[in-house]
Curated annotation (Swiss-Prot):
Recorded consequence of changing residue 151 to A: Impairs phosphorylation by PLK4 and enhances ubiquitination of SASS6
Subunit organization: Part of the SCF (SKP1-CUL1-F-box) E3 ubiquitin-protein ligase complex SCF(FBXW5) composed of CUL1, SKP1, RBX1 and FBXW5. Component of the DCX(FBXW5) E3 ubiquitin ligase complex, at least composed of (CUL4A or CUL4B), DDB1, FBXW5 and RBX1. Interacts with CDC20, EPS8, TSC1, TSC2 and SASS6. Interacts with TNFAIP8L1; TNFAIP8L1 competes with TSC2 to bind FBXW5 increasing TSC2 stability by preventing its ubiquitination.
Organism: Homo sapiens
Span of domain F-box: 3-49
Function recorded in the entry: Substrate recognition component of both SCF (SKP1-CUL1-F-box protein) and DCX (DDB1-CUL4-X-box) E3 ubiquitin-protein ligase complexes. Substrate recognition component of the SCF(FBXW5) E3 ubiquitin-protein ligase complex which mediates the ubiquitination and subsequent proteasomal degradation of SASS6 during S phase, leading to prevent centriole reduplication. The SCF(FBXW5) complex also mediates ubiquitination and degradation of actin-regulator EPS8 during G2 phase, leading to the transient degradation of EPS8 and subsequent cell shape changes required to allow mitotic progression.
GO-annotated biological processes: proteasome-mediated ubiquitin-dependent protein catabolic process; protein ubiquitination; regulation of centrosome duplication; regulation of mitotic nuclear division; SCF-dependent proteasomal ubiquitin-dependent protein catabolic process
Any one of the GO CC terms: cytoplasm
Protein name as annotated: F-box/WD repeat-containing protein 5
Compartments it resides in: Cytoplasm
PANTHER family: F-BOX/WD REPEAT-CONTAINING PROTEIN 5, F-BOX_WD REPEAT-CONTAINING PROTEIN 5
Single GO MF annotation: protein kinase binding
Post-translational modification: Phosphorylated at Ser-151 by PLK4 during the G1/S transition, leading to inhibit its ability to ubiquitinate SASS6.
Pathway the protein contributes to: Protein modification; protein ubiquitination
WD repeat placement: 83-125, 126-178, 179-238, 239-281, 394-447, 458-501, 502-539
Length: 566
């Protein structure tokens, strides 16, 4: 364009030329003149750049909170925590888990070196305290969680013992004095444990009933167990869950239902016909959608068959393990309490855990509603429920993943459950509960809406794992307002955008990445933990520019007056 004259090229032609350029070239060309600057900010141009650069499906609309395509492109490019800023090497063995305080001022780490370390999260991260758990007969620490007001830390670990030992313990640590306040047994150790309220936590215990049949008992424990009266409860039984085919309850977590109607990001439901996952509402009155008890004639047929077997009048065509499972199912039919319904408007919570019904590997997610009157240790404990024949508690919902579950995490609003799983082959049949199907190397990241109990979107896939079923371990994931991140066995952490379902960053370590966690107050800060014994801190390019920008020199209060007198 001539100075002050008419453009030499029409806008439409400049637009067509800019369409053939990449994002960086478009921005550079926009510095040439005012006309090119105006075209370089065109909304249609940046919509094309966005879909092409990020390879987003064209039927996915723009993020509902975005004001323009240019700003949305900039958000995904500039606010993802992908710049490594600090490496922490204080652990001497594999780092297994990370957790942030709700304020974001502190975080905790657990490791195979059997310590729980508490860190101060500042511009430069520093170590505040290290608790050595070896004096308590722990083998290693595996999980931690801050309570709601950040005054207490729950730390979960594994006891020393034989390779097949499944016992663990939960410790509660004061964040004011770093004193150990209480310890609670936890079996199996991969129940992990979690907070239900600010001062009460959930632990597990396991009782064997048969060779492949057991009962998981979930307990509510008071974090402060130095009570003054023997009439004050420090523990209360929450639920008793029947386990079939060598399965157990593991990986407990609590979802608060109070924010379901005002989510940070509303995700659309996917097509249930294309998903291998099945969700059963066990508390529904609609018999057509309930994966619940068998019909009465089937129950009677099973009962008569077992009676004839016990009396020696029939020869079972089942293996000993299959026969045990049938007997356990029959026992549960008359000794399981139906799901208890909450009153209208009651503030309930969901207890979420992994379980199964076909094999020992966790392939289902159990969901049990916790009602307000169950959220306290007050009330009778010994002899509770003796007047009833109902021994087991029924679940409210079951999600069948059709694969090995290796990680779960909740969105900040608690409405969406994200699940890391390694799929079984299509049509796989479990003939022996001790020999689950082979699992895929690809990790699928599935998303479920806990309000509608439906799967949403398609599975995210980029990360990989290589260990077989019997060596498979947990890969912890985390969810922020806009992003979801996960570790992987391929020596990388991964970050996806929750709305567009695209992978935005790969974060490199020297070994398996076990855990990732966003700062709850600043999603542009992410921590990753690895088998390479390090914790890495990652910040966004935008944050790095702000932190590294030169600060103006302070001027004296009357400096402007002095300049006027010259």
């Amino acid at each position: 364009m001539d100075e002050g004259g008419t453009p030499l090229l029409p806008d439409s032609l400049v637009y067509q030329i800019f369409l053939s350029l990449g994002p960086a070239d478009v921005l550079a060309a926009g510095l040439v003149c005012r006309q090119w600057q105006a075209v370089s900010r065109d909304e249609f141009l940046w919509r094309e750049q966005f879909y092409r650069y990020y390879q987003v499906a064209r039927d996915v609309p723009r993020h509902p909170a975005a004001m323009s395509w240019y700003e949305e492109f900039q958000r995904l490019y500039d606010t993802v925590p992908c710049v490594e800023v600090q490496t922490l090497r204080e652990h001497t063995d594999q780092v297994l888990h990370l957790s942030f305080s709700h304020s974001g001022y502190q975080f905790a780490s657990c490791s195979k070196d059997c310590t729980v370390k508490i860190w101060s999260n500042d511009l430069t991260i520093s170590l505040l305290h290290s608790a050595d758990m070896r004096p308590y007969n722990w083998s290693y620490t595996q999980f931690s969680q801050f309570n709601k007001d950040d005054s207490l830390l729950l730390a979960s670990g594994v006891f020393l013992g034989p390779h097949n030992s499944s016992s663990g313990e939960i410790a509660v640590i004061s964040l004011d004095s770093f004193a150990l306040l209480s310890r609670v047994r936890n079996k199996p150790y991969d129940v992990f444990g979690c907070w239900l309220t600010e001062t009460s936590l959930i632990s597990g215990n396991l009782h064997r009933i048969g060779d492949i049949t057991s009962c998981s008992v979930l307990w509510l424990n008071n974090a402060f167990q130095d009570v003054e009266s023997e009439n004050v409860n420090v523990v209360k039984r929450l639920f008793k869950i029947q386990n079939l085919n060598a399965s157990t309850v593991r990986t407990v977590m609590v979802a608060d239902c109070s924010r379901f109607d005002s989510p940070d990001l509303l995700l659309e439901a996917g097509d249930p016909a294309t998903s291998p996952c099945r969700i059963f509402d066990l508390g529904s009155d609609n018999e057509e959608v309930v994966a619940g008890p068998a019909p009465a004639h089937a129950k009677e047929g099973l009962r008569h068959f077992l009676d004839r077997v016990l009396e020696g009048r029939a020869q079972p065509q089942l293996s000993e393990r299959m026969l045990e499972t049938k007997v356990a199912e029959l026992l549960a039919q008359g000794h399981t309490k139906p799901p208890e319904r909450s009153a209208t408007g009651a503030k309930s919570k969901y207890l979420i855990f992994t379980t199964g019904c076909l094999t020992y590997s966790p392939h289902q997610i159990g969901i049990k509603q916790i009602l307000p009157h169950q959220m306290t240790t007050a009330g009778p404990v010994l002899g509770e429920g003796r007047g009833s024949d109902a021994f087991f508690d029924a679940l409210d919902h079951v999600i069948d993943i059709h694969g090995h579950i290796i990680g779960m995490g909740l969105s900040p609003d608690n409405r969406y459950l994200y699940v890391n799983s390694r799929a079984w082959p299509n049509g796989a049949v479990v003939a022996d509960p001790m020999q689950p199907p082979p699992i895929a190397e690809e990790i699928d990241l599935l998303v479920f809406d806990l309000k509608t109990m439906r799967e949403v979107r398609r599975a995210l896939r980029a990360h990989r794992a290589y260990t077989p079923n019997d060596e498979c371990f947990f890969i912890f994931l985390d969810v922020s307002r806009d992003f979801v991140a996960s570790g992987a066995e391929d020596r990388h952490g991964y970050i996806w955008d929750r709305h567009y379902n695209i992978c935005l960053a790969r974060l490199r370590h020297e070994d398996v990445v076990n855990s990732v966690v966003f700062s709850p107050q600043e999603q542009e800060l992410l921590l990753t933990a690895s088998d390479d014994a390090t914790i890495k801190a990652w910040r966004s390019p935008r944050t790095m520019r702000v932190l590294q920008a030169p600060r103006p020199r302070p001027r004296t209060f009357f400096s402007w007056l002095a300049s006027q007198r010259r």
